[in-house]
Each structure stands twice: as structure tokens, then as C-alpha cells.
């Protein structure tokens, strides 16, 4: 299988849009819209009977877009809402349910290509390894998703299980970015577990959603909050999404990573975790927090008073949208230039965009089983992107 025409068009359109807005876009990097057509009867009855919020209470794509408008958010990274689907004991039924939820995300992105960045979701535990791998392939090659997530907490499996690492290998081999719920709400995602995942493909990005938050009790969450902050500084390929985490720790994360400079200052994006959090509340809070960070001389953090200009407009914009935009841009460029994409072009008899489809600098990445994966040259693609954007070849120079 190779990228379908739909996937190629989806990726190309998204890439063009993100390249045109990266210097001003505001992105919510963690949202979970659902299709009401997929709600179970029980969920439908509960929604009709109870207007109050309950954990994970689903919102439709249209509701999400309205909330984004209210909050001044241009785009959202969207994956399915695990609270809106029901698993059974039958892995095939679970595959069908999760497939349908991913299709709903793909269709939402098709309808709103300038608002929605679609991301996939797979689950090796509920689906079984083969079906979970099949879903990864559909997410990337059929629907053109740049990111595929697993949730070790809600789906209940250790983040560094062998089967999870094999799923990471598959996502990477397809050219996409693996993402994980990474929180202190369960014991399934310790910092060492995410480190194992990150070291599996050290030149490849991996996304840790919640940066150690995710809804633990405040005191219980403290050790992972601290460990996550340190982990990212030792693994430059980890990209963190700041959502569902104490605001005080989020502020410290932002100051720490801004002080650390590139690449770390480019490895964080802010988010709401809607519908688990409100977009308006979170982005209202982020904007207010950044206003105080901009006023470094008057800030309570001594690191800021010593570096009062640390949070200039460019720094704030990085965290509010550009960091994630650039991660998706790099990924989309890689997907369009992947061996799978080249295969599709040959099959369709299309001319190559240029003569450089060989990926001659692809890395050899050994896996536990001794098998080798050909992966596209990440650094090379970054260089291409920078040239395309009319700035220097150095990755750090890419950034405003
Ligand atoms: Zn989330």
C-alpha cells in the first residue's frame, strides 16, 4: 500500500496552508472531537438527559470549531475521544469502532482543511497487534494523518511494552510521528518509559501529550511533572504538548525550555485537551500568562528578572502555534517524499516534483528483533523545508 490520492491531496493542501500561516497561526495541540452519528444509544440518552459536564462528555467537530472561534484559536490538532467509543471483548469489533472514530476525524479535516490537523489513534491492546498495525497504515496512507497516538493510560498498557515499541516502529517507518498520552494519572507512562520510546528512534520526533500531567492529584503528580521537565532536556526529539497540567508547572516548563534555547524551545506547544478542558479557559489563561512572561522585569520568577526579554513576540508565537506547525510541516514534507509516496507517483504515471526522490541518506535503525527499517532522512527534509521557506538551512535558523 502507498499513499492514496486522497491522502496525498490532504497532505499537500495542509502543507501549503501551514507554510502560509506558520508565522501567525494559533493552534490548540490537543483536542478530541467526535461524530454524533457514532454515539451509542446509552451515550445519546445520557447527553439528552443531562446537560451537566461529565468526564469526556463528547463534543462534535462543529462544536469544537465554535469553541475555537470563541477562544481565538485558528487550528486544532484533532484525535478521537476515547470516552465516546465503547469497546467489547471482540478485537474485530474494537477495530471497527476505532476505525470509524478515525474516519470521523479524517472527514472533519476534509471539511475544514484550514482549521483541523487530523491525527490518528491506535490501540494494540484492544485491537490486537495486527489490527492495530493495520489501523496505523490506514491513518497514514489512506487518510494522510501526520501523527498517530496511543493512550497507555486510558487503554491500559505500559508505554514501553514490546508491542508498543513495534507499533512505534511502524508509525516511524511510514514517515509519521508517534504520540502518547504521557501523564501521572496512571502508572502506565513513567518518565523512563517515554525515554525508552524516545531512544528507540533518537533522530525522530515523538510527542508526549500532557508533559507528565493528564489529571493526577496535585501531590501525586509532582514527581512526574519534575521528571518530565528534565527528560525533555535530555531527549531533544521529545515534543511536549502542554495540556491538563497545573498552570504553575506549565509556566515553569515554558521558562525552562525557553532558557534552554533551541531545539528545546521549539519542543513545546500549548493545548486545551478539549472536551476534557475548555479551549476558551485554557487559551485565555495562556494569553494572560504570556503577557506576564513578556513583562520579565516584573515577573516573580528570578530567571525571568535576570532575562527580562526572554519572552519576545517570536517566543510566544512559537509556543502558541509555530512549534507545532513546523513539526507538522516537516512531517508532511517527509510523507510526500517517502518511498510510499514515490511509489504512488510511479504507479499513477505522474512526473516527480523534482529529481530527488531517492532518500539516499535514509537512516538504518535497528530494532529489537534485529530487523532494519528504512526511514526517510529527517534532517535532510528539514533542510529542504528551510530552503523552501526562504531562510537558512540550519534548523535553528528556521525559527522566528
Ligand atoms: Zn487529549
PLM features: residue spans?
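Histidine-centered divalent metal-coordination motifs
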Residues: 30-36, 181, 210
Amino acid at each position: 500500500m502507498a499513499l492514496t490520492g486522497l491522502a496525498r491531496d490532504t497532505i499537500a493542501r495542509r502543507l501549503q496552508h501551514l507554510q502560509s500561516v506558520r508565522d501567525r497561526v494559533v493552534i490548540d495541540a490537543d483536542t478530541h472531537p467526535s461524530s454524533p452519528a457514532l454515539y451509542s444509544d446509552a451515550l445519546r440518552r445520557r447527553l439528552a438527559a443531562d446537560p451537566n459536564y461529565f468526564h469526556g462528555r463528547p463534543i462534535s467537530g462543529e462544536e469544537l470549531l465554535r469553541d475555537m472561534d470563541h477562544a481565538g484559536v485558528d487550528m486544532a490538532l484533532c484525535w478521537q475521544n476515547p470516552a465516546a467509543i465503547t469497546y467489547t471483548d471482540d478485537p474485530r469489533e474494537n477495530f471497527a469502532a476505532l476505525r470509524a472514530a478515525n474516519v470521523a476525524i479524517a472527514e472533519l479535516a476534509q471539511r475544514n482543511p484550514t482549521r483541523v490537523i487530523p491525527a490518528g489513534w491506535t490501540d494494540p491492546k484492544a485491537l490486537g497487534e495486527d489490527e492495530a498495525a493495520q489501523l496505523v497504515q490506514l491513518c497514514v496512507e489512506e487518510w494522510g494523518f501526520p501523527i498517530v497516538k496511543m493512550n497507555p493510560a486510558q487503554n491500559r498498557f505500559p508505554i514501553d511494552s514490546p508491542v508498543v515499541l513495534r507499533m512505534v516502529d511502524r508509525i516511524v517507518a511510514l514517515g509519521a510521528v508517534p504520540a502518547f498520552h504521557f501523564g501521572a494519572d496512571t502508572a502506565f507512562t513513567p518518565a523512563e518509559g517515554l525515554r525508552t520510546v524516545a531512544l528507540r528512534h533518537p533522530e525522530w520526533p515523538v510527542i508526549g501529550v500532557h508533559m507528565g500531567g493528564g489529571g493526577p492529584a496535585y501531590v501525586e503528580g509532582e514527581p512526574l511533572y519534575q521528571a518530565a521537565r528534565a527528560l525533555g532536556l535530555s531527549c531533544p526529539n521529545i515534543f511536549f504538548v502542554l495540556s491538563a497540567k497545573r498552570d504553575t508547572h506549565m509556566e515553569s516548563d515554558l521558562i525552562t525550555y525557553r532558557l534552554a534555547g533551541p531545539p528545546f524551545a521549539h519542543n513545546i506547544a500549548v493545548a486545551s485537551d478539549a472536551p476534557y478542558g475548555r479551549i476558551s479557559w485554557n487559551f485565555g489563561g495562556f494569553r494572560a500568562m504570556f503577557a506576564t512572561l513578556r513583562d520579565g522585569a516584573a515577573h516573580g520568577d528570578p530567571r525571568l528578572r535576570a532575562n527580562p526579554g526572554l519572552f519576545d513576540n517570536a517566543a510566544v508565537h512559537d509556543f502558541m502555534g509555530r512549534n507545532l506547525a513546523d513539526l507538522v510541516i516537516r512531517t508532511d514534507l517527509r510523507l510526500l517524499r517517502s518511498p510510499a509516496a514515490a511509489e504512488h507517483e510511479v504507479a499513477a504515471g505522474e512526473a516527480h516534483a523534482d529529481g530527488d526522490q531517492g532518500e539516499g541518506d535514509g537512516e538504518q535503525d535497528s530494532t529489537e528483533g534485529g530487523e532494519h527499517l528504512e526511514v526517510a532522512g529527517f534532517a535532510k527534509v528539514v533542510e529542504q523545508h528551510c530552503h523552501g521557506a526562504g531562510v537558512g538551512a540550519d534548523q535553528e535558523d528556521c525559527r522566528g
